[in-house]
Amino acid sequence: MLRRSLFFTGLYCALLNLAPIGISDANAAADDVLKAENKQSAPLSILPLWKRILEDYAFEGSIEPSQKYRAWKKFIASIENDPPIRQLLKVNLWFNGFPYKQDNWIYGEEDHWATPSEFLENGGDCEDYVIIKYLTLRRLGFPAKDMKIAMVYDVFSGTDHALLVVDLDGENYILDNRDNMTVAAHYTK
């Protein structure tokens, strides 16, 4: 179980279905790990990086897939009949097996959001894990409205970090490339 504490100096979530969101009040109980001000998300169409991901992802489906891309599709097919909680666990674990690499190592850029093909070939940083996990869960039938990208600050490592938060039957689960477990948000104290 995920026991490390992440203290968030800021939590900015965006629902990937372009809808506004609400996050728990910053004055919530001190042990609530998801403390933040109520925020509204901006339409993701204004985010050029996300737009590029969606355009490239649509294009990737029209070309001959690489061996790793075919393995991804085979992985999705292998878990499509699993219960949703098992799908979350397997998606988190499978992608966490890919190498973590910073954008400047791979692309020579400070911030690059990898398409599925790029991630599958090169690995990636935390946003890239979130993107591929999000797209995989969408392919498995998870509604966009039930998934959020959480941008957090980890005071222990001194870095910004991205997580995927998935609402499953009213419970928020965190998928994190730094931890192979998928846990309910209220267990991350």
Outline where the language-model segments fall.
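Bacterial N-terminal signal peptides
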Residues: 9-20
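N-terminal export leaders
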Residues: 3-7
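A structural boundary/capping signal
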Residues: 22-189
